[in-house]
From Swiss-Prot:
GO CC aspect terms: ribonucleoprotein complex; ribosome
Pfam families in the record: Ribosomal_L23
Protein's UniProt keywords contain Ubl conjugation: no
Protein name: Large ribosomal subunit protein uL23
GO function term, MF aspect, one: structural constituent of ribosome
Gene behind the chain: rplW
Length: 93
């Protein structure tokens, strides 16, 4: 069962802010969350049934720190289309 803690953050980038005007919310989650689980989270915690959910997996970048090679954490990103007129107070999460 998915929980609200599976949502790491709501992404605020230039692209995501322009998509918010058309009713699409960009959410960053853990890599083990599926579309169905995210749909359940939105229904249970926000009272909204998403119209469409698109997902992509973002691999962590390889970075160097003090001569050592490391890797940033991988994550999953979801584009969630919410119904027109639905209010989602993202800051209250």
């Amino acid at each position: 069962m998915a929980d609200i803690t599976d949502i790491k953050s709501i992404l605020y980038t230039e692209k995501s802010l322009s998509l918010q005007e058309s009713g699409v919310l960009v959410v960053q989650t853990a890599t083990n969350v599926s579309k169905n689980q995210l749909k359940e989270i939105f229904k249970e915690y926000f009272g909204i049934t998403p119209l469409r959910i698109n997902s992509l997996r973002q691999e962590g970048k390889v970075k160097r720190f003090r001569g050592k090679i490391g890797q940033r954490a991988s994550f999953k990103k979801f584009y969630v289309k919410i119904p027109e007129g639905a209010k989602l107070d993202a800051l209250s999460v």
